Amino acid sequence: MGVDNPFFHRGAIRHVEDFVGREAELAQMLGLLRNGQSISLIGPRRIGKSSLLLYIGNTPIRAPFQLDPPHSLFVLLDCQELAGSPPEEVYELLLDGLLDAATQANLTIDTTEQPGTYRALDRVLQQIYQQGSSVVVLLDEFELLAANQHLTPYFFARLRGLTTKYGLAYLTASQRPLFAITAEETVLSSPFFNIFVTMPLGLFTEAEAHELFHRRLERAGQTLPQGLIAYLIKLVGLHPFFLHIAGYHAIQAINNGEIDASLDHYTEADFQVLDGPIEVEAESHLGYLWQNLSPEDQHVLAIADGPIESLRQLEQQCLLQKVDNTYVYSSEILRRFVRRQDVPGLIQAGPFVIDEQRHQVWGNGRELSLTTSQFSILVRLCRHVGQVVRGEDLEMAVWGDVLVDDPDRLKTLIKRLRRAVDPFGNWIISERGVGYALRPPEE
């Protein structure tokens, strides 16, 4: 990726000037930490948890809350390094981070104890506490530490004890809630897991999405027309990772002369130039999210409807979002991806999702009410999407071998079906003298 493209970020944001948004979450987190409250930050893959932890690790960001040195020392640990470590290695890494932070804060620390022991860690924390400083430990990828089979309930009880003795606070970041990520039930029973306030980290707001484009483009001295930015946000939604992908490919298309940045209006053909590369790069990430869903959740996501617990869980994973009390896909690229998946028990074609067993139909997430005859016609058309289905075959699907002296009965049924599936009735295309087909109306 060329350095001239300001949307190059794919991993964690490490520079303060590149960080965008999350003002509300930051204020809440820092306010809680100032009061010694531990926090469990939960959010799906690539939503920006690591970026947020790195950002608040910067002293000027914490200063307004009096969490800067020497008032408070922040220690950031990446738990990927500790996935299989024994307790001694965890203590030693914590101790090293504390000593570095204490040195930067000009605190005087006596380190006569042997490193790699709980006693050494406790001794240093005691000295820091006596000098009036608080400590916050940031634990990124915390599920790897919590699932470490070398760490017993006693280990986590000791970590909890440090909060009582020295007012130490923890900020953990994980994809799933703490109760779902521990290696054993006995570990979960540790009082350590009862001290956290849970904070979800979700999608950007619309304003934050626009700010991301504005900031990235401004720093690079580049521009994108507002109409193009609006389309990109509609395409990939408000997920910061996918917004970076969209911005990157838009700049590449302009640099390659595939799109004219000076235009005020763009055609569908212009947008299609962007859709391809954006969806190709997003495919593997969407595939990862899909494969990590249970079959039940895949079914619920495909119809954007189902048990409220499943819908809320998919919302927490930033796959669905609630708009006017209705759950909708978080992005157009996600909707297209889901439509390409094979979901047992469902037929997916165009805007329609059909559950044959339950006799239910949805059009772009909205449940439609069809008669048995209308349902049978739509099922047959959706099974052969893009192909012409002969009128005789449609009649057979509805009436079987029953002879009815009404040559217009199929036309009448199709007309009623189009009204029933409005505004998607124009997907049902008449092929004069042959039959009907389900395909996009513009084709």
Pin down the residues of each PLM region.
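Winged-helix-like regulatory helical subdomains adjacent to P-loop NTPase cores
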Residues: 225-226, 234-317
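Conserved NTP-binding/hydrolysis module of P-loop NTPases
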Residues: 73-107
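Conserved P-loop NTPase "ATPase switch" module shared by AAA+ and STAND
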Residues: 128-152
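Positively charged, aromatic-enriched patches within helix-turn-helix-type DNA-binding elements
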Residues: 365-368, 377-413, 419-422
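A structural micro-motif at secondary-structure boundaries
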Residues: 353-376, 430, 437-443
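P-loop NTPase Walker A phosphate-binding motif
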Residues: 44-74
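Sensor-1/coupling segment of RecA-like P-loop NTPase cores
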Residues: 144, 148, 156-188
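Conserved small helical "lid"/interfacial subdomain of P-loop NTPases
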Residues: 199-228
